[in-house]
């Protein structure tokens, strides 16, 4: 009878540990989702400003070619 009680107790401990591990896993996935930033969409209206804002070296190369 003592072995049955021990087996049921160990089964309960395993279930509780599994529930706790799943809970922490869900918490970590929620925190990972919050850190991701929204991607910046490039539309036709702001695409003409890309070489001025992001590719500053392009303007300098164009000036050197004209000199």
Curated annotation (Swiss-Prot):
A GO CC annotation given for this chain: membrane
Keywords attached to this Swiss-Prot or TrEMBL record, sorted alphabetically, are: Membrane, Plasmid, Transmembrane, Transmembrane helix
Compartments in which it is found: Membrane
Where does it primarily localize?
Answer: membrane
Topology relative to the membrane: Single-pass membrane protein
Q: Which residues cross the membrane?
A: 4-24
> What is this protein's record name?
Uncharacterized protein pXO2-12/BXB0011/GBAA_pXO2_0011
Name the species this protein comes from: Bacillus anthracis
């Amino acid at each position: 009878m003592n072995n049955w009680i021990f087996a049921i107790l160990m089964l309960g401990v395993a279930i509780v540990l599994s529930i706790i591990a799943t809970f922490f896993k869900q918490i970590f996935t929620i925190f990972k989702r919050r850190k991701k930033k929204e991607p910046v969409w490039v539309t036709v209206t702001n695409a003409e400003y890309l070489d001025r804002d992001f590719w500053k070296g392009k303007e300098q190369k164009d000036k050197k070619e004209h000199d």
